[in-house]
């Protein structure tokens, strides 16, 4: 009799995906972030579900329902801060996961990569709508500013904004639909994650060398289950430290003031993980141009596979490309810093230069460096 995990229709799928899956023997800790993202998603869905049991999506009571969760619900404060800081961990893991994909050339798995980009957009949309729900000052004004960007679309813009708002301003209808969509999207994301994994398992994982590893594969369990558990423990330690010692470290103090349409905060800014894109948006004086740049700042990832001019897949043995990659990382950190600063000299010019450099590195310098490396290696 064959083992039930290899014969049962349902267990067989799980077995082929997480137990007997052949994995390259050389994959490093940079390959841990996929499983960490799965854990982040599960944590967000569970904490979100319990928060939704106590939350009321109504402009009059939303802010006070969140206060009620923190003060009166058993361990409600843990749920709320796990959910808020869990989103930050989610984005840290996402950025590292995408960075790993760029560095090691994993983007050559085009289906997996493109679904990953769609997932990134979906997670960003979910996080944005979630930020609106506590109905604090930054929630309200963030929603107003970001949804207003749709009005830059020629001809249909204004109609589209009013359609999203459900009225002539961000109000009760907006909050209700944002709550409904914020609840729904993580389940759609979960389904897309399965498709992401389906395409990944069609090709098998990449590895740090970028060389096909079919000749040297090991089973996922126990080797990588143990390795993933180590990553998981480290991530949970970081998350719990944040939740229990500095829960408001990454939040905005303005969001502890109930939303007031008559009083604009001095600096409207999104959560830290959107600041790089927000800086790119602000660096262009034209509204439509800014919106286009904002979308392109993420969509540019879809062009990376088309601009792969190197004869090697990974950057492991490509020092020029490595320098540009780390310059890109430094540039993104600069943009994140600028996004949180007021719109005044010298921050405006720094933001504009960093935005130009961001697109220049990805679209021009990296392909040119790859061609140069090919010539240096006489390929």
Swiss-Prot record:
Chain segments annotated as transmembrane: 33-53, 77-98, 113-133, 178-198, 226-246, 288-308, 320-340, 347-367
Physiological role: Component of the ubiquinol-cytochrome c reductase complex (complex III or cytochrome b-c1 complex) that is part of the mitochondrial respiratory chain. The b-c1 complex mediates electron transfer from ubiquinol to cytochrome c. Contributes to the generation of a proton gradient across the mitochondrial membrane that is then used for ATP synthesis.
Compartments it resides in: Mitochondrion inner membrane
Gene: MT-CYB
SUBUNIT field: The cytochrome bc1 complex contains 11 subunits: 3 respiratory subunits (MT-CYB, CYC1 and UQCRFS1), 2 core proteins (UQCRC1 and UQCRC2) and 6 low-molecular weight proteins (UQCRH/QCR6, UQCRB/QCR7, UQCRQ/QCR8, UQCR10/QCR9, UQCR11/QCR10 and a cleavage product of UQCRFS1). This cytochrome bc1 complex then forms a dimer.
PROSITE patterns with a match to the protein in the record: CYTB_CTER, CYTB_NTER
SUPFAM superfamilies (UniProt xref): a domain/subunit of cytochrome bc1 complex (Ubiquinol-cytochrome c reductase), Transmembrane di-heme cytochromes
Cofactor needs: heme b
Record keywords, A-Z: Electron transport, Heme, Iron, Membrane, Metal-binding, Mitochondrion, Mitochondrion inner membrane, Respiratory chain, Transmembrane, Transmembrane helix, Transport, Ubiquinone
Protein name: Cytochrome b
Similarity comment: Belongs to the cytochrome b family.
Note: Heme 1 (or BL or b562) is low-potential and absorbs at about 562 nm, and heme 2 (or BH or b566) is high-potential and absorbs at about 566 nm.
Membrane topology: Multi-pass membrane protein
Cellular component, GO annotation: mitochondrial inner membrane; respiratory chain complex III
Pfam families for the chain: Cytochrom_B_C (PF00032), Cytochrome_B (PF00033)
Sites where the protein binds heme b b566: 97, 196
Cofactor mode of binding and number, as noted: Binds 2 heme b groups non-covalently.
Residues the record lists as binding a ubiquinone: 201
Keyword Metal-binding on entry: yes
BP GO terms, sorted: mitochondrial electron transport, ubiquinol to cytochrome c
